[in-house]
Amino acid sequence: MDVLVTGGAGFIGSNFVRYLLDNSDDSVVTLDALTYAGSRDNLAGYLDHPNHRFVEGDIRDRELVDDLVADADVIVNFAAESHVDRSIGGAEPFVSTNVQGTQTLLDAALDADIDRFLQISTDEVYGEIHDGKFTEDDPLAPRNPYSATKAGADLLVRSYRETHDLPTLITRTCNNFGPRQHPEKLIPKFIQRAANGETLPVYGDGSNVREWIYVEDNCAALDVVLREGDIGEVYNIGSGVELSNLETTEKILEAVGGSEDQIEFVEDRAGHDQRYAIDATKTKALGWEPEWSFEDGLEACVDYYLGDDE
C-alpha cells in the first residue's frame, strides 16, 4: 500500500510513520511543512529508509498535494496546528491549516480517486463531559479555537463522504504522550522542569481531568482503523486512563525524583474543559487493545526526555 502521511514530522505523525515502516511493507511518503512543532529529527533513522520518502511542503499547496496524492492509495492527515493556548492567542493559522488545508487534501483525494482518507482528530471536538464517556454519536461542542477548527475539519470530511462518496474515516484520540512530543506540551515540559528543579505551573486547582494514551498504542489503533475500519465511520481511540492534571503532575514528580513543593497553581486557562473521556468500544471491536500502562509510558518518557534513551 502506498501511504501519504501529512504532518508526518510532528509528534504523533512521526511516531506513526515509524510504526508503519517497522510493522508493514507499505511505501510511505511523509509531507510536512516543518513549522515549529515538526522536525526532520523526529524521523531520524528513517529518512533514508528504502520504503520512505520525505517531502517538505504545505498541505495548502494544491499543486504539490496533487503530485503526491496521484501516487497514493491512502492519505492519513495529521497536519494541524494543535496547541490550545496558541489558538486562544490567534486563531488564523488554525483555521488556515486545520480547515482550509484539510479541504485542499480532500479535493485532491477526490480527483485522484484514492482508496481511503483517514482524518486524525481529537476528543476535544466533543467539548467537556462531567459524567460518563463520549461515544462517536455524540454531538460536537468544541470550546476553544483549536478544537473548533478540528471539529470544522471533521464536518468537512464527513460532507465529502456524504456528497462525493469519498471513502473517509475519522479517528478521535485522547491525550497522547511519548517520545518526540514538542516541549511545550505538559508531560515533556514538566519532566524537564521537574528535573531542573523548576516550578511546575498547574492551571486552576489541578482538578481538570484528561485521558492519556501512550503514542505507540495510538499508532497501533490508527493502523487498525486505516486497514479494517468501515468507510464513513468515526472511531474513538482511548485508553480508559483518566488522571487529573494534579495527579499527572504528581506522577511526573515521583518519576523524576522531584518535590511536590515544585507545584505552582496558576490562573486557569480561558475555556478550560473540565474533563475529557471517550468510549473506545468501537475501535476495540476491530481487534485493538492498548498495551502500555501510564506508568510504563511515563518511565519511557523520562528516559527519552532526560537523555537516557535517544
From Swiss-Prot:
Active-site residues (renumbered): D123, E124, Y146
InterPro entries with a match to the protein in the record: dTDP_Gluc_deHydtase, NAD(P)-bd_dom, NAD(P)-bd_dom_sf
Gene3D superfamilies to which the protein is assigned, alphabetical: NAD(P)-binding Rossmann-like Domain, UDP-galactose 4-epimerase, domain 1
Cofactors, names only: NAD(+)
Record EC number: 4.2.1.-
Pathway field: Protein modification; protein glycosylation; Cell surface structure biogenesis; S-layer biogenesis
A GO BP annotation: protein glycosylation
GO MF term set: dTDP-glucose 4,6-dehydratase activity
Keywords annotated in UniProt: Lyase, NAD
Enzyme class: lyase
Cofactor binding note of this UniProt entry: Binds 1 NAD(+) per subunit.
Pfam families: GDP_Man_Dehyd
Keyword tRNA processing: no
Null allele phenotype: Impaired formation of the tetrasaccharide present at 'Asn-532' of S-layer glycoprotein Csg. No effect on 'Asn-47' and 'Asn-117' glycosylation of S-layer glycoprotein Csg.
Residues the record lists as binding substrate: 82, 122-124, 175, 185-186, 201-203, 210, 245, 269-272
Protein function: Lyase involved in N-glycan biosynthetic pathway that takes place under low-salt conditions (1.75 M instead of 3.4 M). Participates in the formation of the tetrasaccharide present at 'Asn-532' of S-layer glycoprotein Csg, consisting of a sulfated hexose, 2 hexoses and rhamnose. Involved in the addition of final rhamnose (sugar 4) of the tetrasaccharide on the dolichol phosphate carrier.
Family: Belongs to the NAD(P)-dependent epimerase/dehydratase family. dTDP-glucose dehydratase subfamily.
Protein name: Low-salt glycan biosynthesis protein Agl12
Naturally occurring in which organism (per UniProt): Haloferax volcanii (strain ATCC 29605 / DSM 3757 / JCM 8879 / NBRC 14742 / NCIMB 2012 / VKM B-1768 / DS2) (Halobacterium volcanii)
Phylogenetic classification of the source organism: Archaea, Methanobacteriati, Methanobacteriota, Stenosarchaea group, Halobacteria
